[in-house]
Structures are given as structure tokens and as C-alpha cells.
UniProtKB/Swiss-Prot annotation:
Keywords: Hydrolase, Magnesium, Metal-binding, Schiff base. The lineage of its organism: Bacteria, Pseudomonadati, Pseudomonadota, Betaproteobacteria, Burkholderiales. It comes from Bordetella pertussis (strain Tohama I / ATCC BAA-589 / NCTC 13251). Homodimer. This is Phosphonoacetaldehyde hydrolase. InterPro entries: HAD-like_hydrolase_sf (IPR050155), HAD-like_sf (IPR036412), HAD-SF_hydro_IA (IPR006439), HAD_sf (IPR023214), PGP-like_dom2 (IPR023198), Phosphonoacetald_hydro (IPR006323). NCBIfam families: HAD-SF-IA-v3, phosphonatase. The gene is phnX.
Amino acid sequence: MNAMTLATLPVRLEALVFDWAGTLVDFGSFAPTKVFVDAFARFGVQISLEQARGPMGMGKWDHIRALCNDAAIARQYQEQFGRLPTDEDVTAIYERFLPMQLEKVAEYSQPIPGAIELLHGLRQRGLKLGSCSGYPAAVMQRVLERAEREGLALDYVVASDDVPRSRPAPAMALRNVVELGIADVAGCVKVDDTAPGVEEGRRAGMWTVGLLLSGNAAGLSLEQFLSLDEAGREAARDRARAELQAGAPHYLIDTVADLPPVLADIETRLAAGQRP
């Protein structure tokens, strides 16, 4: 690497791009999973919370399509309707899912412990705070209303239907780069609790941090998390790590409260000329 190239490398972070459910709000990412179960039940198809969590991180229509591609779920649908689920059937389930999600999402969107304090500290450092979500814009509006009441605010928000192609494609992360006026994607960190969300950051050229215990991968409520002893937490970490590694995160931590030491390490690596 020549001196001119080194001179153009960022020497400090410029921005973070956060996911929402399971990352900043909704410990355990329960709002979408429970509604997926209920939406499929309206069509006579029974799915488990574990099945509902499988494609988490995708846009919600894509998530339903992925669930319908599951052999066991598709078989139930065929028994009910005499055919495998088509894209039109996926849309019908999505149209049933959306109002149910709108009704319930704010109820689950309590900030994750440490998130508000973290964001306040990052702002004091002059970092820009972006975000994106697998939720469509209508649902995100409900999340943002609750977040604002709780004192949790970011500089920019992208919903899954704001871009032509959602996760794991990089469009939502890169929309943040453009709108926040970021000079170099290597100065950005993507923080997410799902493998597609981590992969989104990777494809966008960012540093990536996966969250082991606050989100979809572990699937623990805050009460369950707090009740675990260290052996229980380590077992949950192992389960989540196996899932999140599919997105190839640069770092894995328990929750956003553990992010500051990671950011310090990234800044050290940037100063040494490293890139994601």
C-alpha cells in the first residue's frame, strides 16, 4: 500500500448504523416473531417461535416467503389450500401480518438496557447515528414514536420498503452512508442481532458487530436473560454465535452496552491502516 493510499484512510470512526428490534429496542426481538406465528395461524398453518425466528433480519415480505419455502410449513399450507404457497399467497399473509404488527409493535419496543446511554455517549463524541430495519416504514413509524417518548433518537432511519432490495443486500446501510454524508464506508460500523443484518454491513464495506444475547439469535426475554447464571449465558452465547457466524461479523458482543471497547479497537485498527 503506497503513502497516498494510506493518507486517504479514515483515522477515526464517522458513524454507526444500528438495527432496531433486538439491537436498540425489544430485547429478544419478540414483536415480529409472535406476530408471524399469529398471522400464519389465521391461514390454518401452525408455526413455532423458533421457525418464525429463522429468516429474521430480512424484510418482512421476504421473511414470509422464506417461511413458506420451508418444507414443513409449505406442506401444511398445501393441506389447507391444495397448493404450495405462491407469491400471491405470501402477499396475502403479509397483508394480514402488517396490521397485526402495527397494533403490537410499540408494546414490545422498550429500549434495551444501556442503549440510550450508549447513543448519548456516541453523540458526545461527534459520531453520526444511522439505522435500518427489516420493518416496513409504517411499522417503523410506530417504533420511532415509542422510541422518541423513551428518549431514544437517531439521525437517520431506513425501512425495508424504502429500498428496492432489503437485507442481506447492502442498500439500507448504504442509504445511511449517503444521507449522513459519510466520506468512507470503512469509517462506519453496522450493529445487528441477525446474520442477514451483519451480512448487510459486510456487503456495504463496513465493520460489523453481532449481538449475541439481546436479539433474535438467543431469543431470550430480558427477564430470562437476567435470570441466567453465567453457565446459562454462555450456553446462549454458543447458540447465537453459531447462527451469527453465517454473516461473518468482525466482532461479537452480548448487547449494545458492550460496544465502547469494540469501537476503541476499531479506531486503533483504522489508525494502523486496516480496513474492514
